[in-house]
Each structure stands twice: as structure tokens, then as C-alpha cells.
Amino acid sequence: MDKNAVLEIVGRFVRTLEQRGVRVNKAILYGSYASGAQHPGSDIDVVIVSDCFVDKDHWERIRILSDAICEIWEPVEAVAMTPEEWARGDVMIAQFAKNGELVHGG
């Protein structure tokens, strides 16, 4: 899959989340597609930063992301974070994703 296709999929994922009431502050592509080291079968690693996750526990966040992934039916591996969690950067995924590519938001 080329980078344009990946960006289109991430865009569809973000739109699907927003249609479900999640205001996405940022979407950060990280992992193999961000670094250019993808191979056939690579999934699309993305961090979704949203204020909507502030009062949600881990399992509720997974449910929200999983429902959107099922709707677009693409190989997305997503992690939900609040803006504060992203800014602190103390979660291991945030440390990896800091070197990623901002593909939505600012």
C-alpha cells in the first residue's frame, strides 16, 4: 500500500470517529508507514488525541476505536490518548509516536 492510500485510510478513520461524536484534536501516524519501512501486511499505526477520551477508561476507548475500525474495515492499529497524556509523553506509545507524522489537526 502506498503512502497516499494510507493517508486516505487515516482520513476515513478520523471522519468515522468524528461522525460518531469524537472530536479528533490530532492524528499521528507512526510505525512502519511513517518511517517508510512498511512491508506487505503492515498495519497502519495511529495515535488519536481527543478531549473526548478524558472521562473514558481504557476499555471504553478501545470500544470506540474498534467500532470505527470495523466500520472502515482497514488494517488500522489505533491508540486513544487525551491531550494531557500526549503532552506528558509518559506512555510508551507516545514516545514512539513523537517521531511520527501529524496527519490531522495541529
PLM feature spans:
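Catalytic core of pol beta-like nucleotidyltransferases
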Residues: 1-25, 35-40, 51-106
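P-loop (Walker A) phosphate-binding loop of NTP-binding proteins
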Residues: 32
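Short beta-strand->loop micro-motif that forms the acidic, two-metal-ion catalytic signature
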Residues: 45-48
